[in-house]
């Protein structure tokens, strides 16, 4: 290890949960030395070598965790769908709402009509509660434009959010989210547009870090998704997939075939799907908010993910229809309560495994030397409290790239 004699800032006085290896890996009364935006030393304060720090910050107890990562959101969209919330409470299914012109398509209309500035202002409003909870990295998908102009518009807004606020934003092109109204009955023709026009242009403009698709009976078939993935490969972009949310189509196996960085939802994933994901290194992104709001009854196969050592990430799935959730902390509790995950698994799901689901595990997700100085200081005594408490207990301090975030 390189000897450290100087640093920009030294932080100590709290217990540190590093999440190395997906476990708490507690450092009692730890210390973190930072130079620039990187951690240059971390360990017990009692073992701190002689380091000259330009600035010292002393915490009075509490817990430090890695900055939270929300690895699956649809945060940029026009309007909301609160009327559909009422419909679902009256027994109308998600599929029925979509068949009657609601669902994703109603948001597509609103998103196409909105200006870039309007979308930006609405997204800023939605993003700020997540920042307040300690989210330091977020993924934002397109998928409500469904034509070249509007998909580009959404991705530009997502990139702009990362320029305006102290948060890392990863963007995903989800043009294969639903069939736009002008292509009803012509899904293959729309996939032509996605593959030959939208994905190449998004790649040219460097607006996306990955490509996603929705593999489901009410969206696109595995064969159509495979075409999207081939186009993404040609453009040099990694892939992700909404898979097995409402039915078993072996989408997760298809995702694994293309070494997708994640497959998401997965309520209907089979053992063979999970085996394929394990072999490919594909992360399972679980979305308890959508499960809860849709009042689903089939849980993702948590025991199979454990058995085959598939990393489990968690995310808000913030979107206007099926998961209008602006709290990643709430997802920790839901994952434990609804899916029977442990608090330790849940915290790994919004730190190290979420980083892996975005392909940023080399720089984020755990607290260790060489990684970004992103962390959250909580006024808590045990990490399980992050999943235990519903509401309240906002972070005392969020540090983003070595600086206290206002």
From Swiss-Prot:
The keyword S-adenosyl-L-methionine does not apply. N-formimidoyl-L-glutamate binds at residues 144, 319, 321. Pathway: Amino-acid degradation; L-histidine degradation into L-glutamate; N-formimidoyl-L-glutamate from L-histidine: step 3/3. It is found in: Cytoplasm. Binds 1 zinc or iron ion per subunit. Signal peptide: none annotated. Its cofactor is Zn(2+); Fe(3+). It catalyses: 4-imidazolone-5-propanoate + H2O = N-formimidoyl-L-glutamate. It is an enzyme of class 3 (hydrolase). Its EC number is 3.5.2.7. One of its GO terms (molecular function) is iron ion binding. Keywords: Cytoplasm, Histidine metabolism, Hydrolase, Iron, Metal-binding, Zinc. GO terms for cellular component: cytoplasm. Disulfide bonds: none annotated. Zn(2+) binds at residues 72, 74, 242, 317. It holds the Pfam family Amidohydro_1. GO terms for biological process: L-histidine catabolic process; L-histidine catabolic process to glutamate and formamide; L-histidine catabolic process to glutamate and formate. Fe(3+) binds at residues 72, 74, 242, 317. 4-imidazolone-5-propanoate binds at residues 81, 144, 177, 245, 322. Belongs to the metallo-dependent hydrolases superfamily. HutI family. Catalyzes the hydrolytic cleavage of the carbon-nitrogen bond in imidazolone-5-propanoate to yield N-formimidoyl-L-glutamate. It is the third step in the universal histidine degradation pathway. This is Imidazolonepropionase.
